[in-house]
Amino acid sequence: MKAEMKVELLSHTPSEAICATAAHCCVSQKIDIIDGEENIRKSTRHSIQSGHDSILEHWSATFAISGVSRAFLAQLSRHRLISLSVQSQRYVNMNGFDYVIPESIENDEKVKEKYVEFMRATSDLYEIMTELHNIKEEDSRYILPNACTTNIVFTANARELKHIFSLRTCNRTQKEFRDVANEMMKICKEVAPIIFEGAGAQCEITGYCVESRGCGKYPKKK
């Protein structure tokens, strides 16, 4: 069955003041709690503009991500400074698994028909293996496709989240990951607007493209 992607914020550091307080700690004789929206914004912005963005590591968020492909998981896991807990294909029976259909396949009726047939055939074989032949899930999972969906609990600090957003909201990013990144970024900007001020694709921040093959929205860096 075709899956629907969902991103949900499970928890986050309650106050943006933590980053401003950390910044103030570095240049003061004692630790003072920075409060007041304008003071927090001024301190945080000054630190980031000065290249002192390690203060962002004191703020973190945890997301639940569902209805995404194992192909997405492979890309997400390349970001090393994150914490992941993933639905196990070894212990969870995947009979009747959901799957992701990329937009290009969705828009080609003939290819989509064959694609869906393949997913159903794979699902049928998986069920035969696990139910009729008592082959364990840990071995039956070898036939599961990259399109098979998974559930993820994902935690990262604000510095790493902004780094992910700078790369994965780019038009060159595969659409599935771009959709997830944009949804996470939207949520982060709602709960921590000061910290995530200016978050987004690198080109939106710098005004030029650093990709070897850009989308054409911004000129290449000379």
Regions found by a protein language model. Name each.
Residues 1-222:
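Family-specific signature for flavin-dependent thymidylate synthase
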